[in-house]
Amino acid sequence: MRFSTASRHAVAAAYLIRLLSITFGQNVIVVDASVLAVALGDYGTDGQHARERLAGETLVAPELVDLEVVSVWRRHVAAKLMSARRAASAVADLADLPLRRSSHQSFLHRIWELRHVVTPYDAAYIALAEALDVVLVTADARLSRASGVHCEIEAIDGASGG
């Protein structure tokens, strides 16, 4: 029996959610919208690579992450890069993902300090990773080259988020 790409992705996403639920409390990483958009919305090798990197980690992100991820998928649907059905499934997976969301309010000063280097959205992820002293995982290679940050930024090779 052959499974459709959508079925394989649904199984992979469910596996990631289950695996993260079981291992919640292990290694903590901050994840940005680009890597989550790929992990939950991409059925190909980029998505698989992102899911493998996130598996077994405790995921943390600023609470704006949900809006940013949904915005990525909205653009992909509008550009016909993703079906609305697939995006709706990915939104459901995002809602079920054991992701600790953190308010960005306490990081506003650091976000402002980073204004010349990155957008305020990206700065929120950086500030959170700095505060937790953990790695920030992204699918945005440009972000991984940002200067003046005080955390490790790991870009997932081959992933093209955003």
Where are these regions (language model features)?
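Short loop/helix-cap segments at secondary-structure boundaries that form the rim of catalytic
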Residues: S144-H150
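Short, well-structured N-terminal submotif of metal-dependent ribonuclease cores
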Residues: R2-L64, H76-R85, A159-G162
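Short acidic-hydrophobic, aromatic-tinged amphipathic segments that line or gate anion-handling sites
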Residues: R101-H104, I153-G158
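Active-site neighborhoods of divalent-metal-dependent phosphate/nucleic-acid chemistry enzymes
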Residues: F3-R8, A12-L19, L97-R142
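Active-site-proximal, substrate-binding regions of enzyme catalytic domains
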Residues: V70-P98, S102, R110-I111
